[in-house]
A protein has these predicted regions:
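Beta1-alpha1 glycine-rich phosphate/pyrophosphate-binding loop at the start
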Residues: 2-76, 148, 160-186, 193, ...
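Glycine/small-residue-rich loop that forms an oxyanion/phosphate-binding "nest" at active or ligand-binding sites
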Residues: 80-143
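FAD-site-proximal beta/loop scaffold in flavoenzymes
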Residues: 117, 122, 127-144, 243-289, ...
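A conserved FAD-binding loop/helix module that cradles the flavin
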Residues: 160-162, 275, 281-321
Length: 321
């Protein structure tokens, strides 16, 4: 078995948060190691058109943007590793990371940038049209549905907020919910029910999403009444799935403090977690905004905080000698 690899900073995850953290850590001469994980590039690799990332006047492709971030991180000195961290031990110093390949890393600090995954319906037709009419982010993709008819699936705060946001663009928004009442906050429900652009279909679920192949686009959905089993079809230009997100916190479960929602809890105005030296950036800690640009900002914060943590530790060791 090879000897463990020592590092000042190990970054877990390769979305905007991870790569930005790597860029800043490398420029601080911390020689960071970034372990990409199971989906190099994060959620942007399944996003077709990106129109809201600063610096690009024209529409860019999500995978292309992540390629540029990876190249920049490597260019400034990040060691990028294609592997998956399967175990993170924070009770010891330095932290111990074990990878799927068997490689072991010993890190003085760790930046957790594992992200969060949107929960999907699990339909084959949903998978077929992801990025071509099926989305899990109204803020990202709502602009493309000006004067079109869209469907929002869900009944919590996220679904209601997405529906309200989409009324800025769509001509009609239909909320499909499998129950006969919303779980969303009352003030959000009041806004939704007062909006003339929004219609609600209760006790129903998406049974199938249909459309065209060349070019790929959604044209209609089939709904199933969960009480009667009755099937109906309705036209739709887009379907927004808003049934929640699942933060990728498996590595730190039981080791760091999590919010009730399951996201990593960080100190106010910080990326510091309840474990000194462990920082969380991006969607694994951000349950509110979940945008590429905010994830990048948190990655920057995490790297700067890791640098300060290491400097403080070095000063303390020097003073003790």
């Amino acid at each position: 078995m090879p000897a463990p690899i020592h590092a000042k900073v190990v970054i877990i995850g390769s979305g905007p948060a991870g790569y930005t953290a790597a860029i800043y850590a490398a420029r601080a001469m911390l020689e960071p190691i970034l372990i990409q994980g199971i989906q190099p590039g994060g959620q942007l690799t399944i996003t077709t058109d990106v129109e809201n990332y600063p610096g690009f006047a024209d529409v860019i492709q999500g995978p292309w943007l992540m390629e540029q971030m990876e190249k920049q991180a490597a260019h400034v000195g990040t060691k990028i590793v294609t592997d998956l961290v399967t175990k993170l031990e924070t009770a010891q110093r330095p932290f111990r990371l074990t990878c799927d390949s068997g490689e072991v890393y010993l890190a003085e600090t760790v930046i957790l940038a594992t992200g969060a995954q949107a929960r999907w319906l699990g339909l084959a037709s949903e998978e077929k049209f992801k990025g071509f009419g099926v989305s899990a982010c109204a803020t990202c993709d709502g602009f493309f549905y000006r004067n079109k008819e869209v469907i929002v699936v869900g009944g919590g705060n996220t679904a209601v907020e997405e529906a309200l946001f989409l009324t800025n663009f769509a001509s009609k928004v239909t909320v499909v919910h499998r129950r006969d009442h919303f779980r969303a906050e009352r003030i959000l429900q009041d806004r939704l029910f007062k909006n003339p652009k929004i219609k609600v279909i209760w006790d129903s679920a998406i049974d199938e999403i249909a459309g065209e192949d060349k070019p790929a686009k959604v044209t209609r959905v089939r709904l199933k009444n969960v009480k009667t089993g009755a099937l109906t079809e309705m036209p739709a230009d887009g379907v927004f799935i808003a049934i929640g997100h699942a933060p990728a916190t498996e590595l730190v479960a039981g080791q760091v403090k999590l919010k009730h929602s399951g996201y990593v809890e960080t100190a106010p105005n910080s990326t510091a977690t309840s474990v000194p030296g462990l920082f969380a950036a991006g969607d694994v800690a951000d349950e509110v905004y979940r945008q590429a640009v905010t994830a990048a900002g948190l990655g920057c914060m995490a790297a700067l905080e890791a640098e300060r943590f290491l400097s403080l530790r070095a000063s303390e060791r020097a003073a003790a000698e």
